[in-house]
């Protein structure tokens, strides 16, 4: 009997904790009446009600499912227990900085550039932003999906699922040990710095969402910790937990030194970098580079004269060793799949949305291919999901598809290439060609004498100035 009661007791405690968290956020919101607290993102006045509403949705879904969702270690119940305890701790820290309820004006010290109180509040606002993004990613609409969460980078996803199984969160010490099996971590200060970088919510745990953000920031996977060490630990231009406004303030001292720059993880586009730099006319601009490793962006920016002096310092670290070209990536299309394309009077290379241009973009994490014009038009319509599978678009990579003559085709050799996988991100993932949407009006097919091959391109794009909202690059 006691065994049957225990789960219900935990569900009851969880429901109470969710209710307490919502009420706590409401009280905190009442302390955020000063309009200066919502000048630029991340804004506590915006984040608090959104987080409270998401927690209500989580509570409703949990009640409807009888506390459901995958349980067990590192499952939904463990995540909420850790999350709510961390939320309470961070809320108390914010409450101590804000004026009491009923008082409309906050301490001017909170808004003075460079003050200790402002730095503390800005960091806590960023942590709250991370916590809202994490909860939204693992409980979209209040329903748990952590056991099905897809990491953006295929090798990172493979590592997590093989090492952590269906868990969505685990203690730092255990995660550090698991990561060390493929990316050894030096104990001491290096391990502490790594924990500070990965643990976006400062909870002492690592969630699958936080690891996803980390692996997107410090891609590619084979040199993950080397990239992190050179870009975050050793680079004078790296700034953690900094907002748009704070970047503007920090670079004010460098306005007479064009080419000065600093970079930070974007507050509002998690998994992407934001780079602030001083232009040739002394203006301070900020940009979010489009879906390529930061080392490559900084090398290109240095070559073009944009990123020369990290944080105004004369020495610019040499990142050449991180900018080596990655091996070409191939997609082997099986004979059966090719037959499907030919039956539609199409080819693998042709974009299946417009049926006019060749595919030149790979969507992440789902891996579907289409042409850049169709992707731009699709995202311009405010759609942030893949047009084929409706998976969230977290990024994309430019690709070039061309005929590969290095081996006989499946048709010529008489051997099916069904067993050949697709090599992406220097790791193996299952064979998967994009789905074939119904298109009766496709143009005539091209000769079928070769298999396509996909290769990542490394193109340049000049920095584009941003506003404080950190919009995605065009």
Swiss-Prot record:
Binding of 4-O-phospho-L-tyrosine, residues: 264
Tissue-level expression: Ubiquitous.
Region annotation (4H) ranges: 7-145
GO cellular component: membrane raft; plasma membrane
UniProt activity-regulation remark: Phosphorylation at Tyr-341 is necessary and sufficient for the activation of E3 activity.
Region called Linker, residue ranges: 322-350
GO molecular function, one term: calcium ion binding
Catalyzed reactions per annotation: S-ubiquitinyl-[E2 ubiquitin-conjugating enzyme]-L-cysteine + [acceptor protein]-L-lysine = [E2 ubiquitin-conjugating enzyme]-L-cysteine + N(6)-ubiquitinyl-[acceptor protein]-L-lysine
Subunit note: Interacts with ubiquitin-conjugating enzyme E2 UBE2D2 and UBE2D3. Isoform 1 interacts with EGFR (tyrosine phosphorylated). Interacts with the SH3 domain proteins LYN and CRK. Interacts (via RING-type zinc finger) with TGFB1I1 (via LIM zinc-binding domain 2); the interaction is direct and enhances the E3 activity. Interacts directly with RET (inactive) and CD2AP; dissociates from RET upon RET activation by GDNF which also increases the interaction with CD2AP suggesting dissociation as CBLC:CD2AP complex. Interacts with SRC; the interaction is enhanced when SRC is phosphorylated at 'Tyr-419'.
Role according to the record: Acts as an E3 ubiquitin-protein ligase, which accepts ubiquitin from specific E2 ubiquitin-conjugating enzymes, and then transfers it to substrates promoting their degradation by the proteasome. Functionally coupled with the E2 ubiquitin-protein ligases UB2D1, UB2D2 and UB2D3. Regulator of EGFR mediated signal transduction; upon EGF activation, ubiquitinates EGFR. Isoform 1, but not isoform 2, inhibits EGF stimulated MAPK1 activation. Promotes ubiquitination of SRC phosphorylated at 'Tyr-419'.
Further information: This protein has one functional calcium-binding site.
Domain notes: EF-hand-like and Sh2-like domains are required for N-terminal inhibition of E3 activity. The N-terminus is composed of the phosphotyrosine binding (PTB) domain, a short linker region and the RING-type zinc finger. The PTB domain, which is also called TKB (tyrosine kinase binding) domain, is composed of three different subdomains: a four-helix bundle (4H), a calcium-binding EF hand and a divergent SH2 domain.
Protein name: E3 ubiquitin-protein ligase CBL-C
């Amino acid at each position: 009997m006691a065994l049957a009661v225990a789960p219900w007791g935990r569900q009851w405690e969880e429901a109470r904790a969710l209710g307490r968290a919502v009420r706590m956020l409401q009280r905190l919101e009442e302390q955020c009446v000063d309009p200066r607290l919502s000048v630029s993102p991340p804004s506590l006045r915006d984040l608090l009600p959104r987080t409270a509403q998401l927690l209500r949705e989580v509570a409703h879904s949990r009640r409807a499912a009888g506390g459901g969702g995958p349980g067990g270690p590192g499952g939904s119940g463990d995540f909420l227990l850790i999350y709510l305890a961390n939320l309470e701790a961070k809320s108390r820290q914010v409450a101590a900085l804000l004026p009491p309820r009923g008082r409309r004006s906050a301490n001017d010290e909170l808004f003075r550039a460079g003050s200790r109180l402002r730095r503390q509040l800005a960091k806590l606002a960023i942590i709250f932003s991370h916590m809202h993004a994490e909860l939204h990613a693992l409980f979209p609409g209040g329903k748990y999906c952590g056991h099905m969460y897809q990491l953006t980078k295929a090798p990172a996803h493979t590592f997590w699922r093989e090492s952590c199984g269906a868990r969505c969160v685990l203690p730092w010490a255990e995660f550090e040990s698991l990561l060390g099996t493929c990316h050894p971590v030096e104990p001491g200060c290096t391990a502490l710095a790594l924990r500070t970088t990965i643990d976006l919510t400062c909870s002492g745990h690592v969630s699958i969402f936080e690891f996803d953000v980390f692996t997107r920031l410090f891609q590619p996977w084979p040199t993950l910790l080397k990239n992190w060490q050179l870009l975050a630990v050793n680079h004078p231009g790296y700034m953690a937990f900094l907002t748009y406004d704070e970047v503007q303030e920090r670079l004010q001292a460098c306005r007479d030194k064009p080419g000065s720059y600093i970079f930070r993880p974007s507050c509002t586009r998690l998994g992407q970098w934001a780079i602030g730099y001083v232009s040739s006319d002394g203006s301070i601009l900020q940009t979010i580079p489009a879906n390529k490793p930061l080392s490559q962006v900084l090398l290109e920016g240095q070559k073009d004269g944009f990123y020369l002096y990290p944080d105004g310092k004369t020495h610019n670290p040499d990142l050449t060793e991180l900018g080596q070209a990655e091996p070409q990536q191939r997609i082997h299309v099986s004979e059966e799949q090719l037959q499907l394309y030919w039956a539609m009077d199409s080819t693998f290379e042709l974009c299946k949305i417009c049926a006019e241009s060749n595919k030149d973009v790979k969507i992440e994490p789902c891996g579907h291919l289409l042409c850049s014009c169709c992707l731009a038009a699709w995202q311009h319509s405010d759609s942030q999901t893949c047009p084929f599978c409706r998976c969230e678009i977290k990024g994309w990579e430019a690709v070039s598809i061309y005929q590969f003559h290095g081996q006989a085709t499946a048709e010529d050799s008489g051997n099916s290439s069904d067993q050949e996988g697709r090599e992406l991100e220097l790791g193996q993932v299952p064979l998967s060609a994009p789905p074939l949407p119904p298109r009766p009006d496709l143009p005539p097919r091209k000769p079928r004498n070769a298999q396509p091959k996909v290769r990542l391109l490394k193109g340049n794009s000049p920095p584009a100035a941003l506003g404080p909202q950190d919009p995605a690059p065009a």
